[in-house]
Amino acid sequence: MPTIQPVLEAAIQLFSQLDSARLEAEVLLSHVLRVKRSYLYTWPNGLLTAHQINQFQALCQRRLQGEPIAYLLGHKEFWSLELQVTPATLIPRPETELLVEQALARLPIQSDAQVVDLGTGSGAIALAIARERPRCRVLATDNAPEALVIAQQNAQRLGLQRIQFRVSDWWQALEQVTAAVVVSNPPYVAITDPHLTQGDVRYEPRNALISGKNGLAAIRLLITQSLVHLEPKGWLLLEHGYNQAAAVQKLLTRQGYAMITTYPDLAGQPRVTVGQKP
């Protein structure tokens, strides 16, 4: 009967063209075996059943076709929270944690403020804020009901009860809502962007990625309709593309926002721009 080490080494060779061949093979095999990665080294001679091998090889083939690891595993870590993800949701990125950081910087520890997360997807941003500011009232919206189902399941599994979820096309279902902080990681990729044919994004929901010819359609709509939904001195925080900061700042300025600032992500790229309602 085959054992762990040769099966793992064969997968690493299969993944030789991937940047993280060993890591990805280990992650997939430990997922199939429902063990931690360290188990693979502690028990290299552990026996594998035919079913386990078939399951592992099927995942490897899907990965070779470019399917994201997060979708193969069914989960992704964000802000130290393990979140369920499916092809109905965007895969949370590390750079989006900057958006959470900047939101928390504007919410005192004991704050019970109203926070709105527009386009929540898997719920990553809303859940991270709710975890760090448990007294805040968090409302998370998305125009995709299937994504909201995943977000709600994540909230329930994590025991985060003070979050409301609502189907809404941006501001559409929020007529009576005003917030101290509004955050959004909206679609901001141009429809002609060549990256759409590369890597993980090929498998992610297009409506969570693409936003018009220059990638600014959703951001423009969010900004131009935002003031009525913010309390006095309230904050709007937006993630955007590395080359969109100037355009986002200009849109905020036109609406009369103050304290407009852009923050870089860990790679040094302009990633989050914020503005305060006068």
Descriptions of predicted regions:
Residues Y188-A218:
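Mobile active-site "lid"/loop adjacent to the S-adenosyl-L-methionine
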Residues S30-R106:
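Conserved AdoMet
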Residues K213-Q276:
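Conserved Class I SAM-dependent methyltransferase catalytic core
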Residues M1-Y41, N45-L48, A58:
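Non-catalytic accessory regions of SAM-dependent methyltransferases
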Residues L18-D19, R133-R135, Q156-Q161, H229, ...:
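Short helix-capping segments at alpha-helix termini
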Residues A70, V189-T192, N243:
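Active-site beta-alpha loop architecture of Rossmann-like, nucleotide-cofactor-dependent enzymes
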Residues L98-H195:
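Conserved SAM/SAH cofactor-binding pocket of Class I
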Residues L28, G66, T96, I125, ...:
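Residue-level signal for inorganic ion chemistry
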